[in-house]
């Protein structure tokens, strides 16, 4: 069994990419479980055709404790037999959502949820912002990490930060970076830019996913593209990505870059203008 995790900036399309890729894997005959590690509990909605799956933390709060839960209450089978679990988290402004990830994964292990699987995938909230959300990396639960990014500066900044988190635990936990997934935003020279970022981070751009409105059409119906329009070229993109992950033998310890190096990269590709210190902080009328 391989345990992988999808990380990336909030709003980059991480959950959508993960669900479509896992759907493609299941279509290939792989036995898959998705563990959502986001308080929004939206990591399984396209597989289950639901708004949000009831989470481990939510059910534990209703029943009194995690020990009072039955596995079939929190683990639901969706399309292609994909097993789905959402860790969930507390109400906004109360408690630590990262604790929900820790509690849920521990419960799933003890309840035997990891038996008879080929792939377990963790869909993790945004950046590596706290120890709880870094838990799949920190405790070696996820052995390989895939970072969803794009040619936008903040998406690349987040990818570099996540690479730092992987590096921190690479020697103690054995976690490795499997590659960057470019979820295209149609920025200039995007594929070249992410390939160069990958090179500097000592990894690969494992796949470039082109922008296609069919993804949004499928999402509105709470479906993956694989199910909604299986003959669409976009469905084949996710199948290619799934196949590349299954056969990926390039798992590396990343080499994060500095913020200055990232800005230089963007300048080299013409995404960001050479900084002119004389105009910083000046309004248009003054500058």
From Swiss-Prot:
Keyword 4Fe-4S: yes
InterPro entries hit by this protein: NifH/chlL_CS, NifH/frxC, Nitrogenase_Fe_NifH, P-loop_NTPase
Catalytic activity: N2 + 8 reduced [2Fe-2S]-[ferredoxin] + 16 ATP + 16 H2O = H2 + 8 oxidized [2Fe-2S]-[ferredoxin] + 2 NH4(+) + 16 ADP + 16 phosphate + 6 H(+)
Enzyme class: oxidoreductase
Domain of life per record: Bacteria
UniProt modification remark: The reversible ADP-ribosylation of Arg-99 inactivates the nitrogenase reductase and regulates nitrogenase activity.
PANTHER family: LIGHT-INDEPENDENT PROTOCHLOROPHYLLIDE REDUCTASE IRON-SULFUR ATP-BINDING PROTEIN
Protein name: Nitrogenase iron protein
Any GO molecular function: metal ion binding
Ligand binding ([4Fe-4S] cluster): 96, 130
Family: Belongs to the NifH/BchL/ChlL family.
Lineage: Bacteria, Bacillati, Actinomycetota, Actinomycetes, Frankiales
């Amino acid at each position: 069994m391989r345990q992988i995790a999808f990380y990336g900036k909030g709003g980059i399309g991480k959950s959508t990419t993960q669900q479509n890729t896992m759907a493609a894997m299941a279509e290939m005959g792989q036995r898959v479980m998705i563990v959502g590690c986001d308080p929004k509990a939206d990591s399984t909605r396209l597989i289950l055709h639901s708004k949000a799956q009831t989470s481990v933390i939510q059910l534990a709060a209703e029943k009194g404790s995690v020990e009072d839960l039955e596995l079939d209450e929190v683990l639901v089978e969706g399309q292609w037999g994909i097993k789905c679990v959402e860790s969930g988290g507390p109400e906004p402004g109360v408690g630590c959502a990262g604790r929900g990830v820790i509690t849920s994964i521990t419960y799933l292990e003890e309840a035997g949820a990891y038996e008879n699987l080929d792939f377990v995938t963790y869909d993790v909230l945004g950046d590596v912002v706290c120890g709880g959300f870094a838990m799949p990396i920190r405790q070696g639960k996820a052995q390989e990490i895939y970072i969803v990014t794009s040619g936008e500066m903040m998406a690349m900044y987040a990818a570099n930060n996540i690479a730092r988190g992987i590096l921190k635990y690479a020697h103690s936990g054995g976690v490795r970076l499997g590659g960057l997934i470019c979820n295209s935003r149609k920025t200039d020279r995007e594929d070249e830019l992410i390939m160069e970022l990958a090179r500097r981070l000592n990894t690969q751009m494992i796949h470039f996913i082109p922008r296609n409105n069919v993804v949004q059409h499928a999402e509105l119906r709470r479906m993956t593209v694989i199910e909604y329009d299986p003959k669409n070229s976009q469905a084949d993109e996710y199948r290619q990505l799934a196949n590349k992950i299954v056969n990926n033998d390039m798992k590396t310890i990343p080499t994060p870059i500095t913020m200055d190096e990232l800005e230089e990269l963007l300048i080299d590709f013409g995404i960001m203008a050479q900084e002119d210190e004389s105009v910083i902080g000046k309004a248009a009328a003054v500058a």
